[in-house]
Amino acid sequence: MKHLLTFALTLFAVVAIAQNPVLGKWKTIDDETGRIKSVVEITERNGKIYGQVIELFRLPDEDQNPICDECEDDRKDQPALGMEIVRDMVPVAGALEWEDGTICDPKNGKIYDCEMWLEEGNMDELKVRGYIFFLFRTQTWLRQK
């Protein structure tokens, strides 16, 4: 019985370590107002990370179902709700970082190179940086619990 318990605990620990810590639901925060803008669900497909908007938090006077009419790729004229805004993020070996992907701003249709990272000891704040050349903006997304 003792061996079975030890085996079960070891298996649980291995599975917990193997799970990608970035996966899950993250609240995006408006840089200017501090309000929650949306919830993005981060998933993994074929070893890459993707993020889809699964919930929007809009003020009563705002369009409740905005579309990306400024997008120029397959997201053109698609609703922001349900849109895949993060694509093709690749994990950095040995780090809590993902890079070489893109992020789309559905408000203006612009697509930016993207990198994301979790800081050791704080798995509930995801740093998301969109950039073009040397210009960048970093947001902190909060894990939805």
Which residues does each predicted region cover?
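General beta-strand recognition
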Residues: 27, 50-52, 98, 125-127, ...
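C-terminal terminal-subdomain/extension
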Residues: 113-117, 123-125
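Hydrophobic h-region of N-terminal signal peptides that target proteins for export
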Residues: 9-18
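Edge beta-strand at a domain terminus
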Residues: 123, 129-145
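Positively charged n-region of N-terminal signal peptides that target proteins for export
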Residues: 1-4
